[in-house]
Amino acid sequence: MILEHAVLQVDPSQSARFEAAFDVARTIISEVPRFIRLRLSHCLESPERYLLLVEWEDVESHTIGFRQSTGYEKWRELLHHFYEPFPTVEHYSTVLEV
């Protein structure tokens, strides 16, 4: 299992619109093969910041399976205009879990 990590910067005045758009977008990503689950969290200390964590079976499921899918174009249309700056996306493998 791979964990995708992205810190999303969104204008706080757009939070409700962003969250509504993300609610639609989650149906797109959840249909991608080898997607496991995602969590979107809103930062309590910094209202412009969200943390997106997505679990995939492997990196290629995200970088190829999702990003090269027809659904990714719709995902981009729904969400990318909210990000300023555009987020860095990284992938992690579990070392230790309790």
Kindly label every feature range from the protein language model.
Residues 2, 39-51, 76-98:
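Glycine-rich beta-strand-turn "strand-cap" elements at beta-sheet edges
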Residues 3-8:
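Active-site-flanking beta-strand signature of metal-NTP-handling nucleotidyl enzymes
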Residues 9-19:
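Short, surface-exposed ligand-recognition loops at beta-strand->loop->(often short) alpha-helix junctions
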Residues 16, 60-62, 97:
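Residue-level signal for secondary-structure boundary sites
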